[in-house]
């Protein structure tokens, strides 16, 4: 793949939240809420966008009843070694998007405004959003992760929500995180 080509992008189903059903118009019924992450297969190394629900928090387990796929298993299913992941971009720090970031040793990109919001009580599961030392890459606004992959600030769902734009050739894909929520039929 040359720099000009579009990297392959694959979706990971990281959890299904049983206690928060969403309407599925094609089936005319409520269905469990899926939690997705993404892998951008970039020549500089895989980039993970969102890491799903964490494992082992009794409050989250009791309230939301998630069926969680360990991030390492989801990556393995796509042929990605967790040790090869070059970067993580978290769309935001709610529990269902940042929960398994600690399973990876690479840099984690988060908006400064999101990081600040996550330090307040009841914003997230603190231990799941705890990113320490050199791994934490605070971003102010738009930024490049690596050539052809950039972060775009998309506040709204949270103060520091961010999306990822992947470009290659004449194509552009936006991994919107949760700045746009469509029904299950569109996911």
Region roles according to the model:
Residues 13-73, 77, 163-177:
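Conserved beta-strand hairpin/beta-sheet module of binuclear metal-dependent hydrolase folds
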Residues 152-162:
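Active-site glycine- and acidic-residue-rich loops that bind
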Residues 4-9, 42-46, 143-151, 168-173:
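Beta-strand-turn-beta hairpins that frame and shape the catalytic cleft
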Residues 67-96, 110-153:
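Metallo-beta-lactamase
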Residues 99-104:
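Metal-dependent catalytic neighborhoods of phosphoester/phosphodiester hydrolases
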Residues 51-54, 93, 113-114, 157-158, ...:
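Active-site metal-binding loops of divalent metal-dependent hydrolases
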């Amino acid at each position: 793949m040359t720099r000009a080509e579009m990297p392959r992008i694959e979706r990971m189903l990281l959890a299904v939240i049983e206690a928060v059903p969403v309407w599925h118009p094609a089936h005319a019924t409520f269905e469990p809420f899926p939690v997705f992450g993404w892998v951008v297969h970039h020549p500089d190394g895989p980039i993970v966008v969102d890491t799903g629900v964490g494992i082992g928090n009794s409050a989250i387990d009791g309230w939301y009843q998630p069926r969680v796929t360990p991030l390492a298993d989801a990556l393995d299913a796509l042929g990605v070694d967790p040790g090869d992941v070059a970067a993580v971009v978290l769309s935001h720090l709610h529990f269902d998007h940042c929960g398994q970031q600690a399973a990876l040793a690479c840099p984690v990109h988060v908006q400064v405004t999101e990081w600040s919001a996550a330090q307040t009580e009841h914003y997230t599961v603190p231990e799941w959003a705890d990113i320490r030392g050199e791994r934490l890459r605070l971003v102010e606004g738009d930024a490049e992760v690596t050539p052809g992959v950039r972060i775009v600030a998309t506040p709204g769902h949270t103060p520091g929500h961010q999306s990822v734009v992947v470009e290659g050739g004449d194509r552009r894909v936006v991994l919107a995180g949760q700045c746009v929520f469509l029904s299950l039929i569109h996911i």
